[in-house]
Design a protein with these regions (language model features):
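Walker A (P-loop) phosphate-binding motif
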Residues: 21-77, 178
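A transmembrane-helix-recognition feature enriched in membrane-embedded lipid enzymes
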Residues: 1-36, 328-332
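Short, flexible loop segments at boundaries between secondary-structure elements
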Residues: 204-208, 258-263, 301-332
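C-terminal accessory "lid"/substrate-recognition subdomains
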Residues: 146-279
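Residue-level signal for inorganic ion chemistry
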Residues: 12, 51, 89, 124, ...
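Acidic beta-strand-to-loop metal/phosphate-binding motif
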Residues: 280-287
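Hydrophobic residues at beta-strand termini and immediately following loops
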Residues: 40, 99, 141, 201, ...
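Phosphate/Mg2+-binding loops and adjacent switch elements
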Residues: 66, 72-193, 200
């Protein structure tokens, strides 16, 4: 019922998006920043796996001899504080400059002036940020979703129409283990993009980071077996990590619901502490941990806080995607 009421608003939103895209399609307002740009984004609100994909791209570029920087918008940040994604990237990619600002052109100018050795920029969530010219435009498609069921905001989750997929240089299917009909997904992407996906990937917990008053230790997934957990996932799809924890043998005794990017208030921290009295540990995502670490005193918390080490695992096409990315970057640098 609500979706039906919101459809007129979706039509208006679609008209605004179409007008904006038409302007950028002509090249008006597009800025060449002087550095090769690799954009990684999606068509929908909510998580499709951009953070692990951005980190994969950064590591792959470093391994190939490049010196990347990351520019992102910085959703959910408070004035004077870095965003969840910025903190997560900085923690995972030591030495990689990470700049958060709604003005990505200004961020890249700062990168060029303050980090002159950087030779490529990764735009985190850059598909709709069309003001920045890019050599590679990777679009992530969530394998957990059925493409033809998606609607435009606000009645649905689409930031722009599915036909916008055509402007991507490469499409990558994430969470591909959830694709019920691979042939149908492949055909749908070909019809919208003109080519099949360049790669398919899943998201896997490689290990766990256990935070306690004594510090942080890295342990294998087997550590979860038999543990009673309180979970709190401030992400778009909390069912995924909860299911992974239970698949690893953990028992979820309490779940604290939270919206995507939600900060931790003192009342919520107290609620988690209270629930954890009947648990062995609290499980949160990396995005949650960078916020929780600001407000929790591990010396008084009582139980460990566990953060999964999430990685991107390609089931097909990693070499193709990397080759295309490196080729485009090298052409721009010559």
């Amino acid at each position: 019922m609500l979706n039906t009421l919101l459809r007129p608003a979706s039509l208006l939103y679609g008209a605004v998006v179409a007008r904006r895209n038409t302007r950028f399609d002509t090249g008006l307002g597009v800025v060449k920043t002087g550095l090769p740009v690799v954009s990684i984004g999606n068509l929908t609100v909510g998580g499709t796996g951009k953070t692990p994909c951005v980190q994969w791209a950064a590591r792959a570029l470093i391994a190939a001899g490049h010196r990347p920087a990351i520019a992102l918008r910085g959703y959910g940040s408070r004035p004077g504080q870095p965003s969840d994604e910025a903190l997560e990237h900085r923690g995972a990619l030591k030495g990689v400059p990470v700049l958060a600002s709604p003005d990505r052109v200004a961020s890249i100018e700062t990168i060029r002036s303050e980090h002159p050795t950087c030779d490529v920029v990764i735009l985190d969530d850059g598909f709709q940020h069309r003001r920045v010219a890019r050599e590679v435009d990777v679009l992530l498609v969530d394998g957990r979703r059925v493409l033809d069921s998606e609607r435009l905001l606000p009645s649905g989750r689409l930031r722009e129409p599915l036909v916008s997929m055509a402007r991507a240089t490469d499409v990558v299917v994430t969470h591909s283990e959830h694709v019920a009909d691979r042939d149908a997904m492949n055909a749908a992407i070909i019809s919208l993009h003109g080519r099949p996906p360049v790669a398919w990937c899943t998201h896997k917990w490689e290990a766990l980071h256990v935070h306690s008053a004594q510090g942080v230790t890295r342990v294998p997934l087997e550590h979860l077996r038999g543990l009673k957990l309180v979970t709190r996932f401030g992400i778009a799809h909390p069912k995924g990590p909860r299911d992974q924890a239970m698949a690893a043998g953990a028992v979820v005794v309490a779940d604290i619901p939270a919206a995507d990017h939600a900060p931790f208030g003192q009342a919520e921290v107290q609620a988690i502490e209270s629930a954890a009295r009947d648990a062995d540990a609290v499980l949160v995502t990396g995005k949650d941990w960078v916020k929780l670490a600001r407000v929790v005193d591990l010396n008084k918390f009582g139980v460990d806080i566990i953060v999964p080490d999430l990685s991107l695992v390609f089931t097909e096409g990693e070499d193709r995607l990397l080759e295309r990315m490196l080729h485009a970057v090298s052409l721009e640098q010559t």
